[in-house]
């Protein structure tokens, strides 16, 4: 009896959680039947702004997260352990807070912090830890044999990264980029503060400012399609990453020691993004 009650309660909670989505789909289907689906006067610009923000931030986050992931896993230098922990700090800092801080500092210095370029920088710095976490997991699984084989052939750490570790880690990096994209598409505060036309801001403006629920629903459906695509891509890439990891010889990797200017450069590279 208690198990049946728990099942009913779980079903009711699931229905409540899915109810807004079902309403959205119902309104969208009615609009399709009546030919009323329209994106509003700025819908195309908002979709383009979201896609550009997504692509630019994904590129920046991939470079930062992957480079730091390889450096902090497979190179040995003073402060490496603390820098690995520091890479997670952006996850505790909302993108809106980061953009507001930049706008405030820029206004005091006479700079205009506004537009797509700054939005890409903010979102890349706020979300790159997703790529960092998954890439470090993959790099850590690359194992001793691969790195020792590179050393025996006289290949340095960055050449080993480019030739061996990066191809193996690509599915994990792609999954991290998909997680980045889900957060970027749903960001509202930062894009409004920086004046970037986006789907999230467009939905709010269409519903509240323009009193156009049809356009708001249409934009929400476009957002839903993008997010579903990212979810499906993340799941597939995560499974592919596991298959790659299962087929790669494991073991504790021997880190390359860095000294002098190389160690200082590694410390700066790991310290600047957080």
Give residue ranges: language-model regions.
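Flexible interhelical linker loops that connect adjacent transmembrane helices
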Residues: 237-269
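Membrane-water interface segments at the C-terminal ends of transmembrane alpha-helices
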Residues: 2-31, 41-140, 168-188, 216-235, ...
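Peri-membrane helix termini and adjoining interfacial loops of integral membrane proteins
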Residues: 25-35, 194-200, 241-250
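Glycine-rich helix-loop "coupling/hinge" segments at transmembrane-helix boundaries
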Residues: 185-211
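Glycine/proline-centered hinge or cleavage motifs at structural transition points of membrane proteins
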Residues: 153-155, 167
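Amphipathic alpha-helical segments in well-structured domains
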Residues: 40, 44, 86, 146, ...
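Short amphipathic alpha-helical coupling elements at transmembrane boundaries
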Residues: 30, 34-38, 84, 107, ...
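Juxtamembrane helix-boundary/capping and inter-helix hinge elements in multi-pass membrane proteins
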Residues: 75-79, 140-145, 155-158, 209-213
């Amino acid at each position: 009896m208690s198990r049946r009650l728990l099942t009913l309660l779980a079903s009711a909670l699931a229905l409540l959680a899915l109810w807004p989505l079902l309403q959205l789909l119902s309104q969208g289907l009615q609009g399709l039947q009546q030919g009323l689906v329209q994106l509003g006067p700025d819908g195309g610009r908002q979709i383009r702004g979201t896609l550009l923000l997504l692509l630019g931030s994904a590129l920046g986050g991939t470079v930062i997260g992957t480079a730091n992931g390889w450096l902090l896993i497979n190179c040995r230098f003073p402060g490496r352990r603390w820098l690995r922990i520091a890479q997670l700090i952006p996850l505790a800092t909302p993108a809106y807070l980061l953009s507001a801080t930049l706008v405030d500092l820029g206004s005091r210095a006479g700079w205009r912090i506004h537009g797509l370029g700054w939005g890409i920088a903010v979102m890349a710095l706020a979300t790159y830890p997703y790529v960092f976490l998954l890439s470090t997991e993959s790099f850590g699984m690359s194992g001793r044999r691969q790195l020792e084989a590179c050393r025996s052939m006289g290949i340095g750490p960055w050449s080993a990264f480019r030739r061996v570790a990066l191809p193996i880690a690509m599915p994990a990096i792609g999954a991290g980029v998909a997680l980045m994209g889900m957060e970027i598409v749903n960001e509202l505060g930062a894009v409004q503060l920086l004046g970037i036309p986006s789907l999230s801001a467009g939905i709010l403006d269409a519903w509240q400012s323009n009193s156009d629920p049809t356009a708001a629903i249409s934009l929400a459906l476009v957002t839903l399609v993008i997010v579903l695509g990212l979810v499906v891509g993340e799941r597939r890439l995560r499974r592919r990453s596991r298959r790659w990891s299962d087929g790669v010889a494991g073991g504790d990797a021997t880190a390359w020691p860095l000294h002098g200017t190389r160690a200082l450069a590694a410390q700066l590279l790991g310290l600047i993004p957080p």
